[in-house]
Amino acid sequence: MGRIDNTFAKLAKNKKKALVTFITAGDPDLETTESLIIDLEKAGADLIELGVPFSDPMADGPTIQLSSERALAAGTTLPKILATVKSVRRKTQIPIILMGYYNPIFLHGVERFVSDAVAAGVDGVLLVDLPPEEAGEFKAIADRSGLAVIFLLTPTSDEERIRKVAHLGSGFIYYVSVTGVTGARSSVAENVFSDVQKIRKRVTLPVVVGFGISDPAQAGSIASVADGVVVGSALVRQFEQFSGKELHTKLSTMVSALKAGIAA
């Protein structure tokens, strides 16, 4: 059993839900990314999603697009991200998932990427532009190395798509609570609760909900039906206003409040 499975099993045993925090790797630099992973865990994060910056991020709203641009301008590359994960693995066993697009992995070489990622201590990969129908080769290589491949479900996913994701996915299922791009929203869409309940009846993997969750109250309401909650844009927006110690303090405070909201 890997770190992702262990984390969800431990949380379920204690009747708790997961807080998954997303930050862009390399924004503002990879040294900050490494120290933030430790801070986020201390503040209450159960899993870390690291965004792999990409020049054409079609699924990302303006907040994460700008964050990707800052990371790329700072010289962030996939090999450097893997080196950062390898370094932080000396300090923590928190599950780390890389989230991004297929192109950087294709350019790195799929087999080489999977080997390098597992060696660095990456636990899973979520590629927003690699649907299950096209993921066969990547999934087979990842399975051999024990790298979880996480797929998305959306409000428009039909029964066939749910079945495919349930069959092919590992780690957890990421339910996108809204159609469109990433970004914090002021309220939770009504369909989320019934959709998540429907999905959970059909799958054995944990179901986490992301896109648009921005405050403890929203996180708490989502956690009432899901196995975990992902918060990204609300955290990443802080990188536009804060840096250094102020950034660490701001994110830690937000994550502590989100964790309390989930536990409420």
Curated annotation (Swiss-Prot):
GO cellular component, one term: cytosol
Keyword Amino-acid biosynthesis attributed: yes
Pathway: Amino-acid biosynthesis; L-tryptophan biosynthesis; L-tryptophan from chorismate: step 5/5
Keywords (A to Z) from UniProt: Amino-acid biosynthesis, Aromatic amino acid biosynthesis, Lyase, Tryptophan biosynthesis
Active site: 49 (proton acceptor), 60 (proton acceptor)
Substrates-to-products reaction catalysed: (1S,2R)-1-C-(indol-3-yl)glycerol 3-phosphate + L-serine = D-glyceraldehyde 3-phosphate + L-tryptophan + H2O
Gene Ontology MF annotations: tryptophan synthase activity
SUPFAM superfamilies noted in UniProt: Ribulose-phoshate binding barrel (SSF51366)
The keyword S-adenosyl-L-methionine appears for this protein: no
Assigned EC number: 4.2.1.20
Assembly and binders: Tetramer of two alpha and two beta chains.
Homology family: Belongs to the TrpA family.
Listed HAMAP family: Trp_synth_alpha (MF_00131)
Protein name: Tryptophan synthase alpha chain
